[in-house]
Amino acid sequence: MRTLWIVAVCLIGVEGSLLEFGMMILGETGKNPLTSYSFYGCYCGVGGKGTPKDATDRCCFVHDCCYGNLPDCSPKTDRYKYHRENGAIVCGKGTSCENRICECDRAAAICFRKNLKTYNYIYRNYPDILCKEESEKC
């Protein structure tokens, strides 16, 4: 519970669905989303280019693609509601955009959990300069 409080305090300045996404990540992985995923590999965090470094980084690549398929939505600022049923993330009722953003975030959080065993600390705070390859297409 203490970790949850610390993450919530750290995310107060974050707008929109990034807050919900962070809470989903924490709930699925037990990891602090800011320190564990914000600057991981070539795709976790703002932007992204090159080849995903591992399965976790690929989760971020797919998440970026998912957001890219929502041209009429604002994934980083539109808020949505979700809850848990028997431990599973369930997106709440909302607008079409809110629901699609929630589903993108839900899929990424689950992907992070499924790939916890291959999470590699060498990709935390990974320098962008090492992501030189041409990006894959979504």
Curated annotation (Swiss-Prot):
Record-linked Gene3D superfamilies: Phospholipase A2 domain (1.20.90.10)
Catalytic activity: a 1,2-diacyl-sn-glycero-3-phosphocholine + H2O = a 1-acyl-sn-glycero-3-phosphocholine + a fatty acid + H(+)
Active site (UniProt): 63, 105
Comment on bound cofactor: Binds 1 Ca(2+) ion.
GO molecular function, one term: calcium-dependent phospholipase A2 activity
Cofactor: Ca(2+)
Tissue expression per record: Expressed by the venom gland.
Enzyme class: hydrolase
Residues holding Ca(2+): 43, 45, 47, 64
GO biological process per UniProt: arachidonate secretion; lipid catabolic process; negative regulation of T cell proliferation; phospholipid metabolic process
Location(s), subcellular: Secreted; Host cytoplasm, Host cytosol
PANTHER family: PHOSPHOLIPASE A2 FAMILY MEMBER, PHOSPHOLIPASE A2, MEMBRANE ASSOCIATED
Protein task: Snake venom phospholipase A2 (PLA2) that acts as a presynaptic neurotoxin, an inhibitor of blood coagulation, and has been found to bind with high affinity to intracellular proteins. The response of indirectly stimulated neuromuscular preparations to ammodytoxin (Atx) is triphasic. The first phase, the transient inhibition of the acetylcholine (ACh) release, starts soon after the addition of Atx and lasts for several minutes. This phase is probably independent of Atx enzymatic activity. The effect may be due to the specific binding of the toxin to presynaptic receptors.
Family: Belongs to the phospholipase A2 family. Group II subfamily. D49 sub-subfamily.
Protein name: Basic phospholipase A2 ammodytoxin C
Organism whose genome encodes this protein: Vipera ammodytes ammodytes
